[in-house]
Structures are given as structure tokens and as C-alpha cells.
Amino acid sequence: MIFGELRRLYLIIRVFLSYGLDELIPKTRLALPLRLWRKCLFWMPNCHKDEPLGARLRLALEQLGPVWIKFGQMMSTRRDLFPPHIADQLAMLQDKVAPFDGAQAKKLIEHSLGAPVESQFDDFDIVPLASASIAQVHTATLKENGREVVIKVIRPDILPVIKADMKLIYRLARWVPRLLPDGRRLRPQEVVADYEKTLLDELNLLREAANAIQLRRNFADGQMLYVPEIYSDYCSENMLVMERIYGIPISDVATLEQHGVNMKLLAERGVQVFFTQVFRDSFFHADMHPGNIFVSYEHPEDPQYIGIDCGIVGSLNKEDKRYLAENFIAFFNRDYRKVAELHVDSGWVPADTNVEDFEFAIRTVCEPIFEKPLAEISFGHVLLNLFNTARRFNMEVQPQLVLLQKTLLYVEGVGRQLYPQLDLWKTAKPFLENWIKDQIGIPAIVRALKEKAPYWAEKLPELPELFYDSLRQHKHLQHSVDRLTTDLRGERVRQHQSHYLFGVGATLLLSGTAVVLSRPEWDGLAAGLIAAGVVAWLVGWRKTS
């Protein structure tokens, strides 16, 4: 490692230890080297002993920057893994990160506008409405139409911090295949590259604006999800302006209940929104933590989600979507043979995998899951169990599925927080079955014909000419084949003749030589035989050339 990376690694270790996060090291024999290593760093004491562990973890991640804050946001949705006092603190990373100075934010906005804030906006609030890992948000009113908007501005000097951390993580990832038996199959560098791309994409607010416009268009005709309007004329790489929305944070269950929101329908609708994005649109909001999701105050009996912060989106290709949907259905039907075959067919495991052994391994790991009621089974954990089992059969990590799995865990966490009895399988199964039928049945054929209709309408007038050209090319090809066949037949005849002449010539030469050796007085006959042999050889050689 170069000096800069070592310095950053030292800083990370110092921050973690200064907040006493060594308490998280498990007291097991396997973790003994880590505990010994901690004792060696005795000059780095816990400087925040008065703070609870959850608060110390949150503050440490905030101090380390956006790469670590994003990780904390992801952990905050896993309330099945962390006690409430830690999960509640991590949830604050979603929209309550320490803000930077509002006056500095105003200067950044004016730099992006190329004009004073007052020239485009009224009522600009220098106090941020919310602050997150990548950017913070200020409220204002558009001068041109009086509409309330929020202005999102990227944090200053954030790019060097992200690049420094990612460079360090890349270097550590290169060691994973050398240190872990399964390291190569984990494809750590590819996973890190995917995570880095996700972070860097968030720094380009023009990309976020385009994502929001696409997502808004996808749900324009439905009641399930509302995406605020983007004011593209004011957007740049470092600044985004969008409609201000008023809604109830999805994590504020008490307020949702006070407003009479149908919690069961709201939870089920969240699952439907996710699967609609993934399978119908092939374009899904991949940062659906509670800080980015609200519920409209209107129509609480028919609740509508409001989604913001579209900086991270994901997509699956047609094949991955089909394999994923069929995997879910086969799993919940306990058809483990089908699950194994799908993993092989998709290329997720090598083609030479023993399907019987793979099926048995899946059955062994997954059958105990069905001891629980279906309402308690986690889709995210199903994927995790399947992929962990497949790793034993040389499955490589599929980066395109990592984002999906993370988002699915978000959706599950939020859904069960809203309605603990949520049965994800009951909600998702009809959608998945209908989607598969739609992909392979008559509707799929009709849809394909409709999609190709403009192409065929353009090509139809050209068909007679194309048909004539095809016949002409076929005729020319047939002439060429006939000519080649004749030439090949003649070549074979010539080769046969030359081989025959070589044989005759060799026989005459040997006969002439034998006569010379046995009957010197017959030298005339010998000379004739030898001469005839030479002539036969020359004629045979000429035919071969």
C-alpha cells in the first residue's frame, strides 16, 4: 500500500477505536487474534464512553464519510440482525446526517446557477430541510410559477474522500481471493466496482433527475407510487430542483395509524411496487430505505407511496428476471430439482454441476425454512440461502443480483415494520405467476409482433427485391458449386492418374536396375526400362502440378 492508503487505513482504525467499536468484536476463540490486536493498540482509548453503543456506531460512520454512511443505511433496515437501540441510531443516517454550512450550500447553488439564488427562487431557507451522506436539501419557491420546491446540492469536497476509501477497499478486495478459499468465486473486485459505480452515479444529479423522470413516467397512470416532478431547466451535475412533497415518513408508524392508513394494504402495496418495478419495468428504485419513502396524506384507505432520491437504480435483463421469478415459484412449491436446474441453465453455476447433488444440498438447507409459517419467510433470506448453497458448487457472485437483494431486504424490512403479519409470498406469487405466463404465452407472441410491426412495415416493400436477389444469389451459388464439383472431380482423376504413373515409373526403374545388375549383356533392355520409368515419373509429376 502507498502512504496515502496506509494513512487512511490508520484513520479508519483510529475512528473505530476512539468510539469504542471494538466492543462489537465477538468473544469467541475465532476472534481472539482481533482482541489481541486491540490490546496492542492501547494508545487509542475509547473517547466516548458516555454515549450508548448505537450512537457511537452512528457517529463513527458519519465521521468516516459517505462510503461508510451508505453501509450504515443498509444495516439500518436489518432490524432482524440488530437490537432496536442500534437499528434506531443507524436509521438516523438516512436523513439526519450532520449538515454542512447553509451559507456554503447557497454559494454552491449560485455557482451551479451562474446567478444569485434570489434571481430564480423566493423564500430560500438557508437552514437545510434534510441532510444525508451525499447531499443536503434546502426549500425555496420558484419565481416563475410560485411552486414550492426543494433544492438538492452535493456536499463539497466529497469526491476525493469517496475515491480514497474505494481505492483502499479495492486493494483489500485484491487480497480476498488469496486469503479465503471461496474468495475467487465471490468476485470481490467486481462487487466493489459495482458499489463504486453506484456511489459515483449518486454524485451526478443529472442522472438522478433522469431516473426520477423515468420512474415518474412508469407510474404516471397508477395509484401505487407518486414521484415528484423534476424541474430540469434548473438541474446540473451538482444541483437538482424538484417539487416539494408533503407526506408521512414510512418509518413513522404511529402517525400513519393516527391518520387511519390501511396498514395491511400499504405493506402489500410496497411489495407490489417493488415487483412491478423489477419485472414489468426492468427499472427499480434501489435505495428504498425509510428516509426516501413517504406516504401521501390523501386517501388513507387507499394509500399511495411517495418515492424520492432516485440516485441509485437497478435493472435485470430478461433472462435474469425469468430465472429469478421461476426460482421463487419453484422454491415455494418445494421443487428443489427445478431450482437446481434453473441455477445451471442460467449459468449461475457451472454447466457440469451434478444436479442431483445440488438438489440435495438445496433441500437440506431450505427445507427447514418451511417449518415457519409462510408469512414469516423472508424473500431476501431465501435468496441468501440459495446463493450460499450454490457457492459450494462454484457459483460466482452475480453483481447484478446484489443490488436487487439489498433492495428486497429494504422492502421486506419496511413491509413487516408496517404490518408484522405481512405474507410476502401470498402477495408476490400471483404477480410472478402472471408475469411468467405473460412472457411465454400468446400475449408474449402478440406483444413481440407489435414491437416488430414497424420494422416489418418498413421491410415489407423490399421483400420482392430481396426474394429476387436471393434467387439470383442461389443460382450463382449453384453454378459455383457445380463448377467446384467438376473441378474437384477432375482433380481426383488427375491425382489417381499421377499416382498410377508414379507406381508404373517406380516399377520400370526398379526392373531396369535389376536387369543391369543381373544381366549386364542386356544393357539395351535395361536402358529402355529405365527411360520408360523416367518418362512415367515426369508425366505423373506434371499432372500433380
Curated annotation (Swiss-Prot):
Coarse class of the protein's main subcellular location: membrane
Pathways per UniProt: Cofactor biosynthesis; ubiquinone biosynthesis [regulation]
Active site annotation, chain numbering: D287
Protein name per its UniProtKB record: Probable protein kinase UbiB
UniProt-annotated binding residues for ATP: L129, A130, S131, A132, S133, I134, A135, Q136, V137, K152
Bilayer-spanning residue ranges: 498-518, 521-541
Protein kinase domain mapped to chain residues: 123-501
NCBIfam families: PRK04750.1 (NF003404), UbiB (TIGR01982)
GO BP annotation list: regulation of ubiquinone biosynthetic process; ubiquinone biosynthetic process
Membrane topology value: Multi-pass membrane protein
Family: Belongs to the ABC1 family. UbiB subfamily.
UniProt KW Endoplasmic reticulum keyword: no
The organism's place on the tree of life at top rank: Bacteria
Function noted in UniProt: Is probably a protein kinase regulator of UbiI activity which is involved in aerobic coenzyme Q (ubiquinone) biosynthesis.
Annotated organism of origin: Erwinia tasmaniensis (strain DSM 17950 / CFBP 7177 / CIP 109463 / NCPPB 4357 / Et1/99)
UniProt-listed InterPro entries: ABC1_dom, Kinase-like_dom_sf, UbiB, UbiB_bact, UbiB_kinase
